[in-house]
């Protein structure tokens, strides 16, 4: 069984389903509403667990009801939260998300300032117990410390390179695999054209670099050339968490086979199936469902 650690944030997603995304100020009425745990690393952890991995989530929550719910939900998906730190008299993080009838969304995130960025306490954790460590960029200090400890232990590192105000160059340098969103890659490199931006990112690391582009698929560099995996066409209901799910699946696939093209194809299939159901986690498939889906595109 593949052993995975996912380091980063967990937030409560409060999701409002609307006819169209707001384009101006005013009042809007949602046609449906749900609350579900979210956050890049946390949702990646759920995806990895759904795919049969043994998973630990390493992060921070407050001691409020939201924190209780976030940890309980992760545990219900088979994710171990023994290494998650709880802060006294602290609020947990949350997001408000609006999703339109095409599955596109707007996210407003509240990263709780009560959750201190210090990550020195990760020194107490034995990172050699995992096959791969995935980290998001929303807890920069945590990702840096986790990747440093993982590399010292000879453990593969996978970075979810989404957009963030901070410079993530040092995290990219510590990554064996850095998979960026388009906004994240553009923010890092200052280059809007994705092919050029990907080459620029490659200069920061000896590892592999990827960029996910939604319906345009995923590109990565391998053996000096640019490779491409088209997105699978599905009836999209909700794209919330699709990128997070992709990263969790990519980590599992890379730790299992190591073949980049095969791993990207597998992760793309998992993310596509997730988009066919509402919420960031309810639609995450298991390995059998994913293989059955991929067999349709041979």
UniProtKB/Swiss-Prot annotation:
Tell me the GO molecular function terms.
6-deoxy-6-sulfofructose kinase activity; ATP binding; kinase activity
Residues that bind 6-deoxy-6-sulfo-D-fructose: 13, 27, 39, 95, 138, 244
| Catalyses which reaction(s) | 6-deoxy-6-sulfo-D-fructose + ATP = 6-deoxy-6-sulfo-D-fructose 1-phosphate + ADP + H(+)
Q: Where does ATP bind?
A: 212, 214, 217, 243
InterPro entries assigned: Carboh/pur_kinase_PfkB_CS (IPR002173), PfkB_dom (IPR011611), Ribo/fructo_kinase (IPR002139), Ribokinase-like (IPR029056), SF_kinase (IPR030877)
Q: Tell me the superkingdom of the source.
A: Bacteria
EC number(s)? Answer: 2.7.1.184
Q: What induces it?
A: Induced during growth with sulfoquinovose.
Q: What GO CC annotations are associated with the protein?
A: cytosol
Asked whether the UniProt record includes Cell division among its keywords, one would answer no
The regulatory note on its activity is:
Strongly inhibited by ADP. Activated by sulfoquinovose (SQ), sulfolactaldehyde (SLA) and dihydroxyacetone phosphate (DHAP) (through effects on KM) and by fructose 6-phosphate (F6P), fructose bisphosphate (FBP), phosphoenolpyruvate (PEP) and citrate (through effects on kcat/KM).
Query: Keyword set for this entry?
Result: ATP-binding, Carbohydrate metabolism, Kinase, Nucleotide-binding, Transferase
Sorted alphabetically, the Gene Ontology BP terms of this entry are: 6-sulfoquinovose(1-) catabolic process; 6-sulfoquinovose(1-) catabolic process to glycerone phosphate and 3-sulfolactaldehyde; carbohydrate phosphorylation
Q: What happens when the gene is disrupted?
A: Mutant fails to grow on sulfoquinovose as a sole carbon source.
The annotated subunit structure for this chain is: Homodimer.
- What is the recorded function of this protein according to its Swiss-Prot or TrEMBL entry? Phosphorylates 6-deoxy-6-sulfo-D-fructose (SF) to 6-deoxy-6-sulfo-D-fructose 1-phosphate (SFP). Cannot phosphorylate fructose 6-phosphate.
Q: Which HAMAP family match?
A: SF_kinase
Family from the record: Belongs to the carbohydrate kinase PfkB family.
> What protein does this entry describe?
Sulfofructose kinase
| UniProt source species | Escherichia coli (strain K12)
Q: Which gene encodes it?
A: yihV
């Amino acid at each position: 069984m593949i052993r995975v650690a996912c380091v980063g944030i967990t937030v409560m997603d409060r999701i409002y389903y609307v006819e169209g995304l707001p384009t101006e100020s005013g009042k809007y009425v949602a046609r449906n509403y749900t609350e579900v745990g979210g956050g890049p690393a946390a949702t990646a952890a759920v995806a990895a667990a759904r795919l049969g991995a043994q998973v630990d989530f390493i992060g921070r929550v407050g001691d409020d009801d939201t924190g209780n719910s976030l940890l309980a939900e992760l545990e219900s998906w088979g994710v171990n939260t023994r290494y998650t730190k709880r802060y006294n008299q602290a609020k947990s993080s949350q997001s408000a998300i609006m999703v339109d009838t095409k599955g596109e969304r707007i996210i407003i995130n509240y990263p709780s300032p009560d959750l201190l960025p210090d990550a020195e306490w990760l020194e107490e954790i034995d990172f050699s117990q995992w096959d791969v460590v995935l980290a998001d960029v929303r807890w920069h200090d945590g990702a840096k410390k986790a990747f440093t400890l993982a590399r010292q232990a000879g453990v593969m590192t996978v970075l979810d390179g989404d957009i963030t105000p901070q410079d993530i160059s040092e995290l990219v340098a510590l990554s064996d695999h850095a998979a960026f969103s388009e906004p994240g890659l553009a923010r890092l490199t200052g280059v809007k054209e994705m092919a050029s931006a990907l080459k620029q990112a490659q200069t920061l690391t000896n590892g592999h670099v990827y960029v996910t582009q939604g319906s345009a698929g995923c590109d990565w560099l391998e053996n000096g050339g640019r490779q491409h995996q088209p997105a699978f066409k599905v009836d999209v209901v909700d794209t919330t968490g699709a990128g997070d799910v992709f990263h969790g699946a990519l980590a599992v696939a890379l730790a299992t086979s190591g073949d980049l093209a095969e791993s990207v194809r597998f992760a793309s299939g998992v993310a596509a199936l997730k988009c066919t159901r509402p919420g960031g986690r309810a639609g995450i498939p298991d390995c059998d469902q994913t293989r059955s889906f991929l067999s349709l595109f041979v």
